[in-house]
């Protein structure tokens, strides 16, 4: 069995019964179930949601995105072996830990397969909820260029690259391109201030202004839960991105929940603590792959400059990366997933066939 066959690269062509177009994101695809199938599964499986709640099947892929592009390797390798299963396993672990610690629920109702979640449809808050404990990445680049205000937060003089910030900082950005919000550029992933959110909470999809404080509370508490757990396995939680949304519970009450993924190598920076204490940065996250790309191509500005997006897209489309570069990230993802969960990540020889069989036999969702 070749490496290419072990990778689930295309995840929006499964024969899952749906009445709407499949939503295909950078890594996950979403299949909206019919009203009949949603109601049937809620009843059959006993999901704790309203009887008429809309459900979806969310299928993760092994694709690797960085700098807003999808990358591929030599020999037809269209993703990273084990990446999808590792990301889902990590998120599942943290969502359970959040619940154990009395934090909010997630949108996940069931996990039929390592690549698959059954989720309740949520109304997403249009914010990338970013939390930073250390100054690195885009924040450091801005600081090194002389900026002393970041997302409306005044930064003191004397901060050093890759060192701890004086306090945990929330530095939100827009989720998608938002139009017509005063002071917010109409571009993807634009840094915003807390005041931007307060002044325009409805435009960011908050149901009411009071929920801004609730999202901040859940962001900080979630960060601290993950940070403490990682500390116990000699890992440092550097920064992360959460997403939030609204669902209705079985009684019809609206509640703010965690959604998408949390605390993964895709959405976070995680450093090896012992190496960090020795003065080295060893990434257990996608940052290692980003750094590889920056050194692999002769003009790294293409990857960093948003005005050169057409060149960047061509770079990703036309260049096959060395297989070893994708296997490096595979080892990183599987390794950190196994450390976090305490369980082995098993690679499937044919994940697509497995998913179809389970969703057919156990859920009756395949035509």
Curated annotation (Swiss-Prot):
Keyword Zinc: no
GO biological process, any: 'de novo' IMP biosynthetic process
Keywords: ATP-binding, Ligase, Nucleotide-binding, Purine biosynthesis
Domain of life of the source: Bacteria
UniProt EC number: 6.3.2.6
Enzyme class: ligase
Pfam family, any one: SAICAR_synt
Record-level GO cellular component terms: cytoplasm
Listed GO MF terms: ATP binding; phosphoribosylaminoimidazolesuccinocarboxamide synthase activity
Pathway terms, separated by semicolons: Purine metabolism; IMP biosynthesis via de novo pathway; 5-amino-1-(5-phospho-D-ribosyl)imidazole-4-carboxamide from 5-amino-1-(5-phospho-D-ribosyl)imidazole-4-carboxylate: step 1/2
InterPro entries to which the protein is assigned, alphabetical: SAICAR_synt/ADE2_N, SAICAR_synthase_Vibrio-typ, SAICAR_synthetase_CS
Catalytic activity: 5-amino-1-(5-phospho-D-ribosyl)imidazole-4-carboxylate + L-aspartate + ATP = (2S)-2-[5-amino-1-(5-phospho-beta-D-ribosyl)imidazole-4-carboxamido]succinate + ADP + phosphate + 2 H(+)
PANTHER family: PHOSPHORIBOSYLAMINOIMIDAZOLE-SUCCINOCARBOXAMIDE SYNTHASE (PTHR43700:SF1)
Family assignment from sequence similarity: Belongs to the SAICAR synthetase family.
UniProt name for this protein: Phosphoribosylaminoimidazole-succinocarboxamide synthase
């Amino acid at each position: 069995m070749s490496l290419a066959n072990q990778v689930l690269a295309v995840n929006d062509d499964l024969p899952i019964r749906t009445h709407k177009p499949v939503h295909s994101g950078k890594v996950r695809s979403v299949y909206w179930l019919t009203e009949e199938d949603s109601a049937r599964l809620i009843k059959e499986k006993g999901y704790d949601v309203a009887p008429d709640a809309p459900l979806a099947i969310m299928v993760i892929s092994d694709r690797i995105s960085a700098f807003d592009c999808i990358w591929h390797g030599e020999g037809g390798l269209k993703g990273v072996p084990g990446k999808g299963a590792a990301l889902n396993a990590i998120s599942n672990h943290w969502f359970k830990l959040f619940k154990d610690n009395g934090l909010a629920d997630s949108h996940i109702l069931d996990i039929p397969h390592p690549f698959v979640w059954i989720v309740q449809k949520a109304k997403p808050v249009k914010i990338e909820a970013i939390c930073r404990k250390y100054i690195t990445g885009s924040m450091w680049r801005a600081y090194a260029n002389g900026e002393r205000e970041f997302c409306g937060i005044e930064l003191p003089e004397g901060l050093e690259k890759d060192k701890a910030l004086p306090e945990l900082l929330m530095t939100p950005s827009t989720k998608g391109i938002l139009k017509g919000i005063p002071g917010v550029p109409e571009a993807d992933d634009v840094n915003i201030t807390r005041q931007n959110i307060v002044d325009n909470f409805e435009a960011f999809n908050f149901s009411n202004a009071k929920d801004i404080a609730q999202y901040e509370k859940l962001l900080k508490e979630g960060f601290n839960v993950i940070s403490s757990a990682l500390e116990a396995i000699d890992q440092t939680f550097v920064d992360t991105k959460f997403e939030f949304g609204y669902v209705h519970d079985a009684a019809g009450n609206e509640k703010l929940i965690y959604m998408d993924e949390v605390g993964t190598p895709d959405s976070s920076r995680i450093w090896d603590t012992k190496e960090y204490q020795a003065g080295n940065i060893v990434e257990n996250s996608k940052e290692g792959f980003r750094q590889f790309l920056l050194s692999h191509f002769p003009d790294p500005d293409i990857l960093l400059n948003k005005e050169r997006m057409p060149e960047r897209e061509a770079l990703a489309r036309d260049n096959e990366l060395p297989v070893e570069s994708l296997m490096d990230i595979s080892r990183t993802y599987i390794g950190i997933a196994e450390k976090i969960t305490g369980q082995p990540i098993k690679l499937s020889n044919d994940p697509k066939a497995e998913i179809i069989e389970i969703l057919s036999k156990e859920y009756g969702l395949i035509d």
